[in-house]
Amino acid sequence: MSLGRGKYDFYIGLGLAMTSSIFIGGSFILKKKGLLRLARKGSMRAGQGGHAYLKEWLWWAGLLSMGAGEVANFAAYAFAPATLVTPLGALSVLVSAILSSYFLNERLNLHGKIGCLLSILGSTVMVIHAPKEEEIETLNEMSHKLGDPGFVVFATFVVIVALIFIFVVGPRHGQTNILVYITICSVIGAFSVSCVKGLGIAIKELLAGKPVLQHPLAWILLFSLVVCVSTQINYLNRALDIFNTSIVTPIYYVFFTTSVLTCSAILFKEWQDMPVDDVIGTLSGFFTIIVGIFLLHAFKDVSFSLASLPVSFRKDEKAMNGNLSSMYEVLNNNEDDLPCGIEHTGENISRRNGNLPSF
């Protein structure tokens, strides 16, 4: 592949990945609006087993939006490296959070706004440093990569881990440990992304007039994708049903993306020719997104704004009028009026907080 063509495909994949995030993030808002309209009409809610949402056009608009987003995401893997496309999936969470604050009147606190900003910055860093060229262009090359000893060892290890978690660890600890079902989804997800990548290459070859349907690998990838996605959906739904969504979402994003990046590094060798600064930049962007997603979800139910900051961090209007500027000064002035015993108690409290008094 020529350098110019590689960059052209890279930007097509980037555009498709970002478009996918917008459609998927917006789909949650449309479906939620439709469900809220049904609730106001007194219809039986979906959580109670009702299916009135099938008659609500907003819900269908959300479903079509999600379908369009998934198609765009599928196509993005055919043009851009998985190292770029998979982490950018976090932007759908960002889009959903921003739109919900405007259209669903769901308040986005200070932690959420900082998380959104960090996610944008992390995504930008990843786009700048991600590999620009594709290593695989045909199914024959894909077949050769799948037979690489390094990937065979990795795939065998992943299958063994998945089977152990499904049949041994899951039945015993799946109801109490959040990492069990998420681990199953994540390690299987590494295979599903590889299958999508291979099928994307097959579609490109098919459009070019090549006899792809006669290639057995195309059908193997399709069958593997169906099995992997079915398994992912099954165990992800179990995790969401048992544990809090605000905890499942960021942990799943971290585990899933890490699995995909590891698989891509071994199978497609996208990191092999990357300079050290690009590797560091890509990892830095990824960890920045992780922090942003964590802030966005972990503190979403906490009422916190700029007005909640400590008094010493904000401008005190009383200080301008010659009055005391902080609670510290109030406590400091009252210290002389405290009995000796209370002073020692204060020292003990200070010591428990890690601040030893001077002697």
UniProtKB/Swiss-Prot annotation:
Tissue spec. comment: Widely expressed. Expressed at high levels in the kidney.
An MF annotation (GO) of this entry: magnesium ion transmembrane transporter activity
Gene3D superfamilies hit by this protein: 1.10.3730.20
Transmembrane segments: 10-30, 57-77, 79-99, 108-128, 150-170, 176-196, 216-236, 247-267, 279-299
Induction: Up-regulated by low magnesium ion levels.
Topological domains, Extracellular: 1-9, 78, 129-149, 197-215, 268-278
GO cellular component terms, A-Z: early endosome; plasma membrane
Example GO biological process: magnesium ion transport
One Pfam family matching this protein: Mg_trans_NIPA
Compartment list: Cell membrane; Early endosome
Keywords from the named record: Cell membrane, Endosome, Ion transport, Magnesium, Membrane, Transmembrane, Transmembrane helix, Transport
Catalyzed reactions: Mg(2+)(in) = Mg(2+)(out)
Membrane topology, from the record: Multi-pass membrane protein
InterPro entries: Mg_trans_NIPA (IPR008521)
Biological role: Acts as a selective Mg(2+) transporter.
Similarity comment text for this entry: Belongs to the NIPA family.
Protein name (Swiss-Prot/TrEMBL): Magnesium transporter NIPA2
